[in-house]
């Protein structure tokens, strides 16, 4: 197979639609057993309306810690999400999940914290923001 230059690859990507690129990324992840998870690619859930006074305090803060309280029933999925959020290796991510409650991310902005919380909760974890 002929080797493509970086310019040729970029040219090919420029001609693809977003759906085609998304499909390509999925195939690439499967082929090479990697993830291309970016914090911006995680869909955030709507914030909960409960806790009146506490919610007002959280909105004033500009840095948050994402605390993993427990992994729940889907420990493997939670480990995968932790790896995607932190770029930790498999062993380090597993150790973090096993030793919960532990901070997964520290000092991140509100949007990043909420996206991380939604991703971890989607994987079955119990998460708090501080």
From Swiss-Prot:
It comes from the Bacteria. Keywords: Ribonucleoprotein, Ribosomal protein. It holds the Pfam family Ribosomal_L12. CDD domains: Ribosomal_L7_L12. Gene3D superfamilies: 3.30.1390.10, Single helix bin. One of its GO terms (molecular function) is mRNA binding. InterPro entries: Ribosomal_bL12, Ribosomal_bL12_C, Ribosomal_bL12_C/ClpS-like, Ribosomal_bL12_oligo, Ribosomal_bL12_oligo_N_sf. Coiled coil: none annotated. One of its GO terms (cellular component) is cytosolic large ribosomal subunit. One of its GO terms (biological process) is translation. Belongs to the bacterial ribosomal protein bL12 family. Forms part of the ribosomal stalk which helps the ribosome interact with GTP-bound translation factors. Is thus essential for accurate translation. Homodimer. Part of the ribosomal stalk of the 50S ribosomal subunit. Forms a multimeric L10(L12)X complex, where L10 forms an elongated spine to which 2 to 4 L12 dimers bind in a sequential fashion. Binds GTP-bound translation factors. NCBIfam families: L12. This is Large ribosomal subunit protein bL12. It comes from Thermobifida fusca (strain YX).
């Amino acid at each position: 197979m002929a080797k493509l230059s970086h310019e040729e690859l970029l040219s090919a990507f420029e001609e693809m639609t977003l759906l085609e690129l998304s499909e390509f990324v999925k195939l690439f992840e499967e082929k090479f057993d990697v993830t291309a998870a970016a914090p911006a690619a995680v869909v955030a859930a709507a914030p909960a309306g409960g806790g009146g006074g506490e919610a007002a305090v959280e909105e004033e803060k500009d840095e948050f810690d994402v605390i993993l309280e427990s992994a729940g029933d889907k420990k493997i999925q939670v480990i995968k999400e932790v790896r995607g959020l932190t770029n930790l290796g498999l062993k380090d991510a597993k150790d973090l999940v096993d030793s919960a409650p532990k901070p997964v991310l520290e000092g991140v902005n509100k949007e990043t914290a909420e996206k991380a919380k939604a991703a971890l909760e989607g994987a079955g974890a119990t998460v708090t923001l501080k």
